[in-house]
Amino acid sequence: MIASKFGIGQQVRHSLLGYLGVVVDIDPEYSLDEPSPDELAVNDELRAAPWYHVVMEDDNGQPVHTYLAEAQLRSEMRDEHPEQPSMDELARTIRKQLQAPRLRN
């Protein structure tokens, strides 16, 4: 069994670029159907580790969905980010839904 370092709803930072993001889903290993040429360069060890669907903001404050390897992320210690309140709200909303899921039927 593969253990993931980060959880759904957790705030993380891109380790090279420093962008703040929120984990919205986790794959136990690389699982995109058709990798792009850049993704083909990823080594097998990295592909076998967990990969994360992370929502980040672009330079205009618009949400961007990214797919990142565990090695590309680091933990974010702060819970509040006045410069990016939408990321804080997204993380809170996801964590709240995980704690008390809505029954639809």
From Swiss-Prot:
Family matches, as SMART domains: YccV-like (SM00992)
GO-annotated molecular function: DNA binding
Disulfide cysteine pairs (residue numbers): none
Region (Disordered): 77-105
A biological-process GO annotation: response to heat
A single Gene Ontology CC term: cytoplasm
Cell compartment(s), UniProt: Cytoplasm
Keyword Thylakoid: no
Source organism superkingdom: Bacteria
InterPro entries: Hemimethylated_DNA-bd_dom, Hemimethylated_DNA-bd_sf, HspQ
Any Pfam family matching the protein: YccV-like
This protein's UniProt keywords: Cytoplasm, Stress response
UniProt-listed Gene3D superfamilies: Hemimethylated DNA-binding domain (2.30.30.390)
SUPFAM superfamilies: YccV-like
Function description: Involved in the degradation of certain denaturated proteins, including DnaA, during heat shock stress.
NCBIfam families listed in its UniProt record: PRK14129.1 (NF010729), yccV (TIGR02097)
Family of the protein in this entry: Belongs to the HspQ family.
HAMAP family in the cross-refs: HspQ
Protein name, per record: Heat shock protein HspQ
Gene giving rise to this polypeptide: hspQ
